[in-house]
């Protein structure tokens, strides 16, 4: 049974009904509609913590979707799942693929920065300050890019950049 037929959450049901109406009204081809249905089911499964099911749906959507912008969001969500599972290398691969399809995706840049910052903290805990600084510098570069695309977001990152001396601006927003 498709996920959309067994959804008990009112908000998810409402989203599904609206998405189905939009799909029926918009002039798109059947492949695009099918890709969106898989994407929608992937988002629903991901929201429920059903990551294996979400990945299956996202991979199906990815096989069907041609639009680079839409592909970027599918790839981004796959990256989110890998990051949630602690699979940071895989998450980085998918975030970078998302950026190849859509370079103006600050959330992917932010998540890459978060992974490098995490790695920096881990290196710092083990006393490896050289690696820690390298990871922190990489995090800073990605956060600067994310902030340049979304200057009113990522306030904590902006503060971190400023307090660590990695910011070349006084205030980003």
Curated annotation (Swiss-Prot):
Keyword annotations: Membrane, Photosynthesis, Repeat, Thylakoid, TPR repeat
Pfam families, sorted: TPR_1
SUPFAM superfamilies in the cross-refs: TPR-like (SSF48452)
Record localization: Cellular thylakoid membrane
Gene3D superfamilies per the UniProt record, alphabetical: Tetratricopeptide repeat domain
UniProt xrefs under NCBIfam families: PRK02603.1
Protein name per UniProt: Photosystem I assembly protein Ycf3
Annotated organism of origin: Trichodesmium erythraeum (strain IMS101)
Gene expressing this chain: ycf3
